[in-house]
């Protein structure tokens, strides 16, 4: 039988990662969310022309135009990419400045792009959801530039394929470790605690591969006999930790997942137990499946 204990592998490193969501205050802001959501994603490539190397006033003008276009289409909610690659378009204690701010990873743009985008959204009555990719980290060429001030920089520096693992051209965090999922939860808590975001949102990037090499060290150190169940439980723990982090720091903010539209693929290819998250309390406020196909598709 598959063992269902010891989901979190004991670290063999002295990383001194703080307990999840330590020392972050509760935000008294009342989140702006709608019963009927009409929303759009604004991903990092769409931020590039209005953010990268731009001044605060230029960003304010550019994002304002985006939002005005949204309003003209009846859109009341935006899901804005604030952490696409283990980085941040805001001042973070856990992740370096995104290269999409200045063109260089770790470089402070001299103002707070996230606050600008939130303020402009709220001025128009638009709900602002902070969209993060929790596991996807840096492109291979950017990774050496990440300061070891940050845990992801420290973990990359070890190059051991354990906490952070290279898959094709990108480095990915391994959610088998509590230190890793604590970092992810801290990142969610930081957004909700320090900013008047209306929610935290993630998409369909979970495990990047079905190959066993990705987490073989952690799996072999666990009591699991099934790699699939090991990964499903790791993802579920990460989602539960993020949900708790959001709700602990602003109970009115939402936490949701936009997973793939095919339940089987989610569970067998990405190890995202979307059925569990949808049915049980403590995981998500909503699911927004990515249904990019017609009724004739069997997915």
Q: What positions do the PLM features span?
A:
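Active-site-adjacent "subsite" loops/lids of carbohydrate-active enzymes
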Residues: 30-59, 129-130, 135-190, 194
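Aromatic- and acidic-residue-enriched carbohydrate-binding clefts of CAZyme catalytic domains
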Residues: 35, 46, 86-113, 142-174, ...
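Hydrophobic faces of well-ordered beta-strands that scaffold small-molecule active sites
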Residues: 38-42, 78-80, 128-130, 200-202, ...
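Active-site beta-loop-alpha junctions enriched in small/polar residues
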Residues: 43-47, 83-85, 133-135, 202-207, ...
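Acidic-and-aromatic substrate-binding clefts and catalytic sites of carbohydrate-active enzymes
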Residues: 56-57, 83-88, 107-108, 261-270, ...
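Catalytic domains of carbohydrate-active enzymes, especially glycoside hydrolases
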Residues: 61-87, 195-197
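Aromatic-lined substrate-binding rim segments of carbohydrate-active enzymes
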Residues: 66, 84-133, 227-249
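Polysaccharide-binding and catalytic clefts of secreted carbohydrate-active enzymes
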Residues: 76, 152-276, 280, 292-293
